[in-house]
Amino acid sequence: MKKIVFTGGGSAGHVTPNLAIIPYLKEDNWDISYIGSHQGIEKTIIEKEDILYYSIASGKLRRYFDLKNIKDPFLVMKGVMDAYVRIRKLKPDVIFSKGGFVSVPVVIGGWLNRVPVLLHESDMTPGLANKIALRFASKIFVTFEEAAKHLPKEKVIYTGSPVREEVLKGNREKALAFLGFSRKKPVITIMGGSLGAKKINETVREALPELLRKYQIVHLCGRGNLDDSLQNKEGYRQFEYVHGELPDILAITDFVISRAGSNAIFEFLTLQKPMLLIPLSKFASRGDQILNAESFERQGYASVLYEEDVTVNSLIKHVEELSHNNEAYKTALKKYNGKEAIQTIIHHISEA
């Protein structure tokens, strides 16, 4: 029986692509383990999936000054030793890393044990963790074809993004019942990320009188961001977040308004949903969402509205443009084959 160790964490985006791949490896009888941090989100997610989970020490990798930068290198070193010992006991055939600060000790621990290491990078340019890990890896899979120019040619493989199978199996009838919507108006689903997005939430709510004339709205507004005054608004349903219902909601969705995190937008792409993307500004991030959004716009998958340009009028204008050019967006979206990503990655895992 072949063995694999997965790693990746710090945010859900560094875990969910692993969850897309794991079921296929289970079908092929791989022995699967996961190494992550003691208290990261990856621990909560993976333990629900009935996968052996091992914790190691980890320190955050920062690009800015913080007093914790003095302590964290020692935590990383401790994490490398933890990972080295654990990997030596597990004896995997390959390690697959999705990035995030916890992945660096695991990658180095694997390299020290002479285990082949494969990386996956979701964004247009590699994050700090993958930049460090790359020197210890044999291959790096990229989600965006343009990302290849930032990486060593001999290591890079373009795959697209692995998308969880359950996301593709939504039921429209269940969504209609859950939301209390009719079939008469198109549905817009608005997502601002797990914590929400204050400016998006406020602008959407200001624009509701105009939007609800033509559309029904599902608003995933983030923890603590519900507006009690809108709870019984006809054609408008708001949630802090949804879990099992999300595939059904996406099945009934005609257009998506969203941030431009790579994993989410590739799920929308695979589902062929035209998008209005409002990326995190470069002042609130390293600018990766802007690059992601602009790539999708160039390929005809999405329209981009920059956060500093978000107003009620600009939001309504962009929604109307999506609706007016719906067929053109659909034609572009059909060109993408999302199923190839998982099969390509599994092939290289098996060959490692």
UniProtKB/Swiss-Prot annotation:
Q: List GO molecular-function terms, semicolon-separated.
A: UDP-N-acetyl-D-glucosamine:N-acetylmuramoyl-L-alanyl-D-glutamyl-meso-2,6-diaminopimelyl-D-alanyl-D-alanine-diphosphoundecaprenol 4-beta-N-acetylglucosaminlytransferase activity; undecaprenyldiphospho-muramoylpentapeptide beta-N-acetylglucosaminyltransferase activity
* Name the UniProt record assigns to this protein: UDP-N-acetylglucosamine--N-acetylmuramyl-(pentapeptide) pyrophosphoryl-undecaprenol N-acetylglucosamine transferase 2
Output the CDD domains linked to this UniProt entry: GT28_MurG
Which pathway? Cell wall biogenesis; peptidoglycan biosynthesis
Instruction: Name the species this protein comes from.
Output: Bacillus cereus (strain ZK / E33L)
GO process terms (BP): carbohydrate metabolic process; cell division; cell wall organization; lipid glycosylation; peptidoglycan biosynthetic process; regulation of cell shape
EC number of the protein = 2.4.1.227
Name the family: Belongs to the glycosyltransferase 28 family. MurG subfamily.
Reaction(s) catalyzed by this protein? di-trans,octa-cis-undecaprenyl diphospho-N-acetyl-alpha-D-muramoyl-L-alanyl-D-glutamyl-meso-2,6-diaminopimeloyl-D-alanyl-D-alanine + UDP-N-acetyl-alpha-D-glucosamine = di-trans,octa-cis-undecaprenyl diphospho-[N-acetyl-alpha-D-glucosaminyl-(1->4)]-N-acetyl-alpha-D-muramoyl-L-alanyl-D-glutamyl-meso-2,6-diaminopimeloyl-D-alanyl-D-alanine + UDP + H(+)
Q: Where does the protein end up?
A: Cell membrane
Listed NCBIfam families: murG (TIGR01133), PRK12446.1 (NF009102)
Annotated UDP-N-acetyl-alpha-D-glucosamine binding sites: S11, A12, G13, R164, S194, Q289
Taxonomic superkingdom: Bacteria
As for membrane topology, the entry says: Peripheral membrane protein
Q: Which GO terms describe its cellular component?
A: plasma membrane
Give the function comment from the record. Answer: Cell wall formation. Catalyzes the transfer of a GlcNAc subunit on undecaprenyl-pyrophosphoryl-MurNAc-pentapeptide (lipid intermediate I) to form undecaprenyl-pyrophosphoryl-MurNAc-(pentapeptide)GlcNAc (lipid intermediate II).
Q: Which UniProt keywords apply?
A: Cell cycle, Cell division, Cell membrane, Cell shape, Cell wall biogenesis/degradation, Glycosyltransferase, Membrane, Peptidoglycan synthesis, Transferase
